Amino acid sequence: MKRLLFVLIALLAMLQYRLWLGDKSLADSFHLQEQIKLQQQSNAQLVARNQVLREEISDLRSGTEALEERARNELGMVKEGETFFRVVGGERGGVPEN
């Protein structure tokens, strides 16, 4: 009887060790769940970014307005016959003073 009790206690101790400290333990499980959450957040951000890029590609393929806007903003280009004005001033935000 003592031998059976000893075997059961040893088995219980071994199972507890594996549960708390061994490979695939609860700590590892919690760590993996946290990594999954972080990866899902990263994936959601990338999906949103991809959607924006798809829309931009669609705009560039469909018409010249998006291409013209990009050329104006990024390259500083102007149409023939246009005059470019650069307003240099303070950080008032375009609010006129009375």
Curated annotation (Swiss-Prot):
Its main location: membrane. The keyword Membrane applies. Keywords: Cell cycle, Cell division, Cell inner membrane, Cell membrane, Coiled coil, Membrane, Transmembrane, Transmembrane helix. It is a single-pass type II membrane protein. Residues 1-3 are cytoplasmic. Residues 22-98 are periplasmic. One of its GO terms (cellular component) is cell septum. It comes from the Bacteria. InterPro entries: Cell_div_FtsB (IPR023081), FtsL/DivIC (IPR007060). It is found in: Cell inner membrane. One of its GO terms (biological process) is FtsZ-dependent cytokinesis. Residues 31-74 form a coiled coil. The chain crosses the membrane at residues 4-21. PANTHER family: CELL DIVISION PROTEIN FTSB (PTHR37485:SF1). Part of a complex composed of FtsB, FtsL and FtsQ. NCBIfam families: PRK00888.1 (NF002058). Belongs to the FtsB family. Essential cell division protein. May link together the upstream cell division proteins, which are predominantly cytoplasmic, with the downstream cell division proteins, which are predominantly periplasmic. This is Cell division protein FtsB. It comes from Shewanella pealeana (strain ATCC 700345 / ANG-SQ1). The lineage of its organism: Bacteria, Pseudomonadati, Pseudomonadota, Gammaproteobacteria, Alteromonadales.
